[in-house]
Amino acid sequence: GLSAEQKTALKDSWKILAANGETMVKNSAAMFGLLFEKYPDTKKHFKTFDGDHFAAMKATGMGKAHGMSVFSGLGALVSSVDDGECVLGLAKKLSRNHTARGVTANDFKLMRSIFGEFLDKATGGKATESMKSAWDALLGVLIENHQ
């Protein structure tokens, strides 16, 4: 499970990442933008959006809705970090939803690999090493439970 320090770091970082709805939409678009910049092949999972770029995530209702949905899911994980069974249940639900869309554990690993850089950008350089390692651990739980 996650340590007390990791749980606190997740909660503290979430206050920055998801301060309000506008911030959540902006940060989710930035997160996916970085993923697609580093790993263009991951765009194949998003047939709703233009295959060449992901500006549509910020510009369209569908894009904003997906970003908000992803960040709401992350928020549920952060809100549940003190309940290990709930975190595992959420991880398994997320896995089922993504497996149905052809998203693999390797795709989750790619997201995990860019998350520290995303945190730096989204927090304006205020992400601590504790925050980065806590998110890495939480994303590790998602990967371990991806079937």
UniProtKB/Swiss-Prot annotation:
Give UniProt keywords alphabetically.
Heme, Iron, Metal-binding, Muscle protein, Oxygen transport, Transport
Q: What would be an example GO MF term here?
A: heme binding
Q: Which domain of life is it from?
A: Eukaryota
Q: Which PROSITE patterns match?
A: GLOBIN (PS01033)
Which Pfam families does the protein's record reference? Globin
Q: Per the database record, which ranges form the Globin domain?
A: 1-147
InterPro entries hit by this protein? Erythrocruorin, Globin, Globin-like_sf, Globin/Proto, Mb-like_M
Q: Which residues cross the membrane?
A: none
Member of which family? Belongs to the globin family.
Additional observations:
In contrast to the other dimeric myoglobins, N.mutabilis myoglobin is a highly cooperative oxygen binding molecule.
The protein's assembly and partners: Homodimer.
Protein name per UniProt: Globin
